[in-house]
Structures are given as structure tokens and as C-alpha cells.
Regions:
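Extracellular/periplasmic catalytic domains that process cell-envelope and extracellular macromolecules
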Residues: 16-20, 57-61, 98-100, 128-129
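Soluble metallo-hydrolase cores and metallopeptidase-like ectodomains found primarily
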Residues: 1-26
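Conserved protein kinase catalytic core
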Residues: 35, 74, 143-145
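Conserved phosphate/anionic-ligand binding catalytic regions in large, soluble enzymes, centered on
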Residues: 31
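Short helix-loop-beta-strand segments that form the rim/entrance of peptidase-like active sites
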Residues: 19-23, 27, 37-78
Length: 201
């Protein structure tokens, strides 16, 4: 924690970084109508638990991974609504009501205030208890024709962020897109190909 809060000297920080493990937070389901986000958690856990290849074993040995469903109540409400009609052709995810009195389906719009218990709990884990180096929020929506949107995002970036955070995000995005290119997997949107800006991401 002292390392994450920059409460130590540079020499102590380097020593701790050498002996510690990076923490990666992967969540899904924040927007309960984006079903892939929650379902990928199950698939990701299965892949990590069942594979024995060198890369997976190295990840499990060197990284602490937190897999978190961040809106199970919303998912249950959406699931119940979707399964309500017995005739499958009449099922849809266009739930007619906002199912949270204050923030609707969109719990992540509360993170700047932390008014709701859900966002307060997540913020406590991310910024007090665990302080992961990577926080990956899996959503489902993105520009038409894309599979995933990620950094680098379009400018301008938020002036309250240290520029090293932005270049660090860009480096993660570069590693992601390079890996996808190596595996011949198109569909990664970035910069102006995405609707997301660096102001919020």
C-alpha cells in the first residue's frame, strides 16, 4: 500500500516492486444490459483455472488477478425481465423501468460522488484495499464493426491526471493491439476510431 500511495523513497519503491506482484482487476456486468461483460468473467476464470500452457502458468505465478461481478443485482433484474415471456421470440432486453432509483442502470456514473453503496464498495477495493495497477472494465458497447475499444484514446486527456498515467495506458493499449495483430484478430478501435476520450478513461 505504501508503494501504491507513493509514501516511500524511490529506492524502497524499486525494492518492493521487485519482490511484489502486480494486481489486475477485471470486472464485468456494471451495465447489466451488457451481458457479455459478466459472462466473460466465467470464461476468463475457466481459462485461467484449466490451462497449463507456459503463458497461463506464468501469469498465475506472477500476477494477482481479481475477477469481480460489479452489478449482480442489476443482472438478476435484467435476466428476470428477459426470461419473462415464455415465447423466446418475444424476449428483449429493453426493460421498461430504471431499476435503481438514483443512478438507473448506470452505476458507473456515480463514481465521481460515491453516493451508492455499490460504487463506494468498488472504490474502496480499487483505491484503498487492493490498488491494482490495471483496472479493466469490460463493457459490451462500442463503435459499429469493432470488437474492442481501448487505449490510446482520443485527446484531450484530463489535466488532473499525471501524464505518466496516460502514457502508461497507451503502453497497455499498444501491447494489446500488437498481440491481437500477431494473432490475426482485427477489430480493435482506438484514437478517433472510438467514441471514448482520454478525459474520462
Amino acid at each position: 500500500r505504501k508503494l501504491g500511495r507513493a509514501e516511500i523513497t524511490e529506492a524502497e519503491a524499486k525494492a518492493l516492486a521487485n519482490q511484489g506482484k502486480p494486481i489486475v482487476w477485471i470486472d464485468g456486468g456494471l451495465h447489466a444490459n451488457e451481458v457479455v461483460g459478466a459472462q466473460q468473467l466465467i470464461e476468463t476464470l475457466y481459462e485461467l483455472a484449466s490451462k497449463n500452457d507456459e503463458e497461463t502458468l506464468r501469469i498465475l505465478d506472477e500476477v494477482i488477478i481479481l475477477l469481480v461481478h460489479v452489478n449482480p443485482d442489476g443482472m438478476e433484474i435484467m435476466s428476470n425481465w428477459y426470461m419473462l415471456p415464455s415465447e423466446k421470440t418475444k424476449r428483449n432486453k429493453n426493460i421498461p423501468v430504471l431499476y435503481q432509483k438514483y443512478v438507473g442502470h448506470d452505476n458507473n456514473r456515480d463514481f465521481f460522488m460515491n453516493n451508492m453503496q455499490e460504487s463506494t464498495n468498488i472504490s474502496m477495493q480499487q483505491y484503498v484495499e487492493w490498488m491494482p495497477q490495471i483496472i479493466y472494465n469490460h463493457h459490451q458497447s462500442g463503435p459499429a464493426g469493432t470488437v474492442v475499444a481501448g487505449p490510446p484514446y482520443r485527446d484531450p486527456f484530463n489535466h488532473v491526471f499525471d501524464p505518466l498515467i496516460i502514457t502508461g495506458l497507451d503502453a497497455v493499449g499498444a501491447a494489446m493491439i500488437n498481440r491481437l495483430h500477431q494473432e490475426d484478430k482485427p477489430g480493435f478501435a482506438r484514437l478517433d476510431g472510438s467514441v471514448f476520450s482520454t478525459w474520462w478513461n
